[in-house]
Regions:
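Edge beta-strand at a domain terminus
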Residues: 26, 137-167
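C-terminal segment of classical bacterial N-terminal signal peptides
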Residues: 15-25
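Amphipathic hydrophobic-ligand
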Residues: 56-62, 132-134, 160-167
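Bacterial N-terminal signal peptides that target proteins for export
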Residues: 1-13
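Short beta-strand segments that buttress and anchor functional surface loops
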Residues: 47, 75-81, 102-107, 124-131, ...
Length: 167
């Protein structure tokens, strides 16, 4: 079943576990570093594709987050599993002036996605994601020390449609 899922869908699922997202850009500072320190560590949990061709597909992911030492940002590395199939996942998000940039896997030029902008506001991060004609956003919210919820939406015509939810 997992092998039938398109890489883009799998990366959207991985984004769900990761954490990221888009508000008005602000210079990355100590409050952003506080958010990334909160995301650092082990994350594991279930998610579900809630729209589209693979609607109803459930998955679990396990990622290790490592906060950047010198600048704001994070690297998440691990895997997601659908049934007995396991797919490696990796995301790198770094401050780039007044925004955030990065990639999942090898970026949009390969089999992954590009993170083209992002912002942290309190316990929430929003990033814009892109791959070919796909545009979307991921919103991650820290809720206490051990809980994070993530929603990934893609742009369909003029609306953002949620496609993946995780908590």
């Amino acid at each position: 079943m997992f092998s039938l899922l398109k890489p883009t869908v799998l990366w959207l699922a991985a984004l769900g576990v990761a954490t990221l997202a888009a508000v008005a850009p602000v210079e990355a500072g100590s409050r952003d570093k506080t958010f990334f320190r909160g995301v650092a560590g082990e994350w594991k949990g279930p998610g579900e594709i809630v729209a589209g061709k693979y609607k109803g597909t459930k998955f679990t992911c396990k990622l290790t987050g490592t906060a950047e030492e010198t600048a704001s940002g994070i690297t998440l590395d691990g895997y997601c599993r659908v049934g007995m199939f396991k797919q490696p996942m990796k995301a790198v998000i770094k401050a780039a002036g007044r925004t955030y940039k990065g990639q999942f896997l090898d970026g949009a030029a390969g089999k992954g996605l590009d993170i083209v902008s992002g912002n942290v506001s309190g316990q929430k991060m929003v990033v814009s994601i892109t791959r070919a004609k796909l545009n979307g956003a991921m919103i991650a919210r820290l809720q206490g020390e051990n809980t994070m919820t993530v929603t990934i939406s893609v742009k369909v015509e003029d609306q953002m449609v949620p496609v993946i939810g995780m908590s």
